[in-house]
Design a protein with these regions (language model features):
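Structural motif corresponding to alpha-helix initiation and N-cap regions
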Residues: 12, 66-67, 135
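Conserved functional loop/turn residues at catalytic and ligand-binding sites
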Residues: 23, 56, 77
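Structural transition elements
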Residues: 1-20, 38-42
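Short, flexible coil/linker segments at domain boundaries that flank nucleotide/cofactor-interacting
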Residues: 19, 25-28
């Protein structure tokens, strides 16, 4: 579903101009919540802070235990935060992260346009029919930038050739579609 027309850009001067136009309070220090004890998140947060400082944004990293992080993020008591999430290659899985009524809408989005686009894509049955909706979704997410998809881990998946019904493209850590598996005892 990757939309190659959505450019990834890095333009500190443009970012600074956009913040100035939005009357961003440069004298305010933002609190950036991260989960303690995760060295990858700590390094990523440090890099993000460096980039924000380049455009004049003051940021203080606050390491908290995971329950506190989740509570702050869910209650909207945060300026910035990093939450890892599992998922699949299907963009419809991000619906809950952006739906106004969702319990995991960490960005506190109130606009339903993005979820409406996902719902239209989900109503379609084929990849070809769904792709235009998810292309549009990626464009809108990029325009609004309420969140950033930072990285995904490389994962190697293997299974015994006796097992059939395995849908590798739908693998994630939460859903292995094991109810579709069948084991050929003859092999």
């Amino acid at each position: 579903y990757y939309n190659q027309d959505v450019e990834v850009w890095y333009d500190p001067e443009k970012a600074k101009t956009m913040l100035q136009e939005a009357n961003f309070p440069f004298d305010q220090t933002l609190v950036f919540y991260i989960s303690s004890g995760n060295s990858v998140t700590e390094r990523i947060a440090a890099l993000i802070v460096q980039d924000l400082q380049k455009v004049g944004v003051k940021v203080q990293i606050e390491q908290v235990d995971f329950p506190t992080l989740m509570s702050n993020m869910l209650d909207g008591k945060h300026d910035l935060g990093i939450i890892g999430s599992g998922g699949t290659m299907d963009p419809s899985e991000s619906r809950e992260m952006i739906h106004p009524d969702s319990s995991v809408n960490f960005c506190q989005l109130k606009d339903t346009e993005l979820t409406d686009i996902i719902d239209k894509g989900n109503a379609e049955l084929t990849f070809e029919a769904r792709k235009p909706y998810f292309d549009e979704y990626q464009v809108k997410i990029r325009e609004r930038s309420p969140m950033a998809y930072l990285y995904t881990k490389n994962v190697l998946t293997a299974y015994n050739k006796r097992v059939s019904g395995v849908e590798v493209e739908n693998f994630n850590s939460l859903n292995w579609s094991s109810w579709n598996w069948d084991i050929d005892a003859a092999q």
